[in-house]
A protein has these predicted regions:
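Membrane-proximal helix-turn-helix segments that form the acceptor-binding/catalytic region
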Residues: 143-165
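Aromatic "clamp/platform" in nucleotide-sugar-dependent glycosyltransferases that forms part
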Residues: 290
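Conserved donor-binding/catalytic core segment of Leloir-type glycosyltransferases
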Residues: 166, 200-232, 329
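Nucleotide-activated donor-binding/catalytic signature segment of Leloir-type glycosyltransferases, i.e.
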Residues: 253-270
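Conserved acidic donor-binding segment of nucleotide-sugar-dependent glycosyltransferases
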Residues: 322-332, 340-346
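Acidic anion/phosphate-binding donor-loop and adjacent secondary structure
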Residues: 177, 183-185, 192-206, 277
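Short alpha-helical donor nucleotide-sugar binding micro-motif in glycosyltransferases
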Residues: 269-270, 277-282
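Short hydrophobic beta-strand element within catalytic cores of glycosyltransferases
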Residues: 298, 307-310
């Protein structure tokens, strides 16, 4: 049975049991200026659930320049509340049915939990891409960071330990078990790669490195530039292109000016076609991130036949298969590894071939099935879906 057929079957069985309206809670919406891989992940499974016959509402926070009530790819989007106020606002709205009745709930926990086990008495699941850990100190002042860490690792886990949980990273899977989640309630599945991201065109005539992502502290773009500068001591004509925007853009610009780094290009935000062109032309894609749930740009680049060099962290270990689809290394060694890949055509071709083959195995249809299966299990179990409450 194909993944599309599996998805239709699961949705049909849920509909037969009266479960049609599914609310999906997320901190940010795909149309938010700061949207990233988590938001893309949510859009991919929601659109497919909608196509399979479920009625999906995406509840999220306000996005600048976007209407409060909207629709995208067939499902409804409601954007109300600020970055922090959205959490209590949604809990109250769902408790008192201000957003209408619903039959099942999906909570996407991105640092701050929605605490749905406390107020939701419907079949529900949790999606958690990664534990933020050291990211708290990068995003907030120390007292606030300490509170965030405590909520994420000590206060919230006991509330969720009986909640079916989906993650994309095997490392996050292990972290959840360490925090007390039941092994039988945690599932792990890879993200997909859109068929749009495919090989084509010619590589640049000179050694070229690409980095894609929101320019935030956790992505460590300044450290990546430092590592590419190290690579340039042996590959002097190597260049680096940074695609994306964000709060660190000024810091990045200042570094470029201070080091007269004419070899760095800031491409800014680009559309889908331009992004694919960057993937296709570059010799390799690199990431110096401190933490990732997966690293979607790395597998999109793989779909275009471009291998990766990335930090050896949770998330990257799933998106990049070391010495197969790319190479993983500690941050201080990244420059040396980048230089090695740029200098060795045979190594680069081998990694590119494996990266492309694996990317073709990663589908969003399989992801949509993998996320729906635990919710389906809650709906169809004899207890009527009350086991996780």
């Amino acid at each position: 049975m194909s993944d599309a057929a599996k998805l239709a079957h699961l949705a049909s069985e849920m509909l037969e049991r009266g479960v049609r309206r599914v609310h999906v809670l997320a901190w940010r919406d795909l149309d938010d200026d700061e949207a990233g891989g988590s938001e893309n992940h949510a859009d991919e499974f929601m659109r497919r659930w909608q196509e399979a016959g479920l009625s999906v509402m995406h509840r999220t926070s306000f996005a600048t320049g976007r209407p409060e009530v909207d629709s995208r790819n067939g499902y409804d989007v409601v954007r109300r509340g600020g970055r922090m106020s959205v959490f209590p606002r949604v809990a109250l709205s769902e408790t008192f049915r201000r957003m209408g009745s619903y039959d099942a709930l999906v909570e996407i926990w991105n640092g701050v939990p929605w605490l749905s086990p406390i107020w939701c008495r419907k079949p529900r699941i949790l999606i958690l891409h990664h534990i933020h850990g050291p990211m708290w100190e990068q995003m907030f002042p120390r007292p606030v960071a300490a509170i965030g860490r405590a909520i994420e690792t000590r206060l919230a886990p006991p509330v969720y330990r009986r909640t079916p949980t989906v993650t994309t990273s095997t490392d996050t899977h292990e972290e959840l078990l360490h925090l007390g989640w039941r092994p039988d309630l945690v599932t792990t599945g890879p993200v997909g790669v859109d068929e749009f991201f495919s090989p084509g065109g010619e590589k640049t005539a000179h050694p070229s490195v690409l980095a894609v992502g929101r320019q935030a502290p956790v992505k460590r773009f300044v450290q990546l530039m430092e590592q590419v500068a190290i690579a340039r001591t042996t590959i002097p004509d190597a260049t680096l292109t940074l695609v994306g925007d964000g709060p660190e853009r000024k810091v990045i610009r200042e570094w470029i000016e201070r080091h007269d780094a004419h070899w760095v290009t800031l491409a800014g935000r680009v559309d889908r076609e331009e992004l694919r062109d960057h993937y296709r032309r570059s010799w390799l894609i690199a990431s110096a991130s401190l933490a990732e749930g997966w690293g979607l740009a790395l597998t999109e680049a793989a779909g275009c036949g471009t291998p990766a060099v990335a930090t050896d962290i949770s998330g990257h270990r799933c998106s990049v298969l070391h010495d197969s689809t790319g190479l993983l290394a500690p941050l201080p060694e990244l420059g040396t590894v980048i230089a090695r890949v740029l200098a060795d055509r045979g190594l680069r071709d081998r990694l590119a071939s494996s990266a492309l083959a694996r990317a073709r195995e990663l589908t969003w249809e399989a992801l949509a099935v993998g996320v729906l299966e635990p919710l389906h299990a809650q709906v169809t179990r004899p207890s009527g879906g009350r086991r996780n409450r």
